[in-house]
């Protein structure tokens, strides 16, 4: 609830559409991350899926735009397709190959 309440406190100086960009799918063994992390790729993705469902519900209740490419980033088995993750060492950020997914969602929500 603090996540949404913080967004609701933002008072822009001009009218804007507030949007939440949901967390993305987790790093994969194909692009390993050496920072702190818990569980397998599937466990992390399942947790993110649950969080995103709660976040989407809260966005709807508060008239916020919810944008997610999470499901689009997954393989059929629920693992992350590494093509959407960066190639510059961390594997936890989006790559340029994710841009068409993002642009499609932004257009669908009339943000661009």
Give the positions of each predicted feature.
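Generic structural signal for well-ordered alpha-helical scaffold segments
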Residues: 8-11, 107
